């Protein structure tokens, strides 16, 4: 394999980690007591030019777990009806099983070691995901136990904005506020934002680190 192909692999770019963009919509702010209502993930790939792109998408509506708390303010904020039959919601375990299965395939095909969460204000999604994994007792968690990529932090560095909508617009992406706070839409936009930041850094000469185009400060 030639040097350029090695540097253009996910394994090389992210230190053997397989980045997966995730967004979780919930019925509150406490990951131990408040229900997960919706989850979406997008896996990523490198194209032939070493640019990051979206690959696979999974999106699920989630049944509130037994005894979970539903905060009315959270429901008013995102407009999700937890008990609507039109959502065709599934259990946390079913959703995590499908998500983990897809991620493990991606880890294997890219010769990576672990997956890494990419999310906007990532600690929120990380905490809810971790609580659901503990609650369901599901095995083979593919995610790194503490390393995460937070696009709020990255976009603050890249474009001086930390709010998802503002960061997207600042980097040249459109953002529809009417679709915001849907796990599906927010995951798509977070993935677009992350790819833009990573690819712009490469274009500026920041990757690979010894690229002769690297800008000297």
UniProtKB/Swiss-Prot annotation:
SUPFAM superfamilies tied to this protein: Ribonuclease H-like
InterPro entries according to UniProt: Exonuclease_RNaseT/DNA_pol3 (IPR013520), RNase_T (IPR005987), RNaseH-like_sf (IPR012337), RNaseH_sf (IPR036397)
Keyword Repressor: no
Entry's cofactor comment: Binds two Mg(2+) per subunit. The active form of the enzyme binds two Mg(2+) ions in its active site. The first Mg(2+) forms only one salt bridge with the protein.
GO BP annotations, alphabetical order: DNA replication proofreading; tRNA processing
One cellular component (GO) term of this entry: cytosol
Function per UniProt: Trims short 3' overhangs of a variety of RNA species, leaving a one or two nucleotide 3' overhang. Responsible for the end-turnover of tRNA: specifically removes the terminal AMP residue from uncharged tRNA (tRNA-C-C-A). Also appears to be involved in tRNA biosynthesis.
NCBIfam families: RNaseT (TIGR01298)
PANTHER family: DNA POLYMERASE III SUBUNIT EPSILON (PTHR30231), RIBONUCLEASE T (PTHR30231:SF2)
Name of this chain's protein: Ribonuclease T
């Amino acid at each position: 394999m030639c040097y350029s192909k090695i540097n253009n692999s996910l394994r090389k770019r992210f230190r053997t980690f397989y980045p997966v963009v995730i967004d979780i919509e919930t019925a509150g702010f406490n990951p131990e007591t408040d229900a997960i209502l919706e989850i979406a993930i997008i896996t990523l790939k490198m194209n032939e030019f070493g640019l990051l792109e979206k690959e696979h998408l999974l999106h699920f509506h989630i049944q509130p777990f037994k005894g979970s708390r539903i905060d009315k303010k959270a429901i008013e904020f995102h407009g999700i009806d937890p008990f609507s039959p039109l959502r065709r919601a599934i259990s946390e375990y079913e959703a995590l099983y499908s998500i983990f299965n897809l991620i493990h395939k991606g880890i294997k095909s890219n010769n990576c070691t672990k997956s890494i969460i990419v999310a906007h204000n990532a600690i929120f999604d990380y905490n809810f995901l971790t609580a659901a994994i503990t609650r369901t007792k599901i095995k083979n968690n593919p995610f790194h136990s503490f390393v995460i990529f937070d696009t709020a932090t990255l976009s603050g560095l890249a474009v001086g904005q930390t709010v998802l909508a503002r960061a997207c617009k600042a980097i040249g992406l459109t953002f529809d506020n009417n679709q915001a706070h849907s796990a599906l839409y927010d995951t798509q936009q977070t993935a677009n934002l992350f790819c833009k930041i990573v690819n712009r850094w490469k274009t500026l000469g920041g990757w690979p680190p010894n690229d002769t185009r690297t800008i000297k400060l």
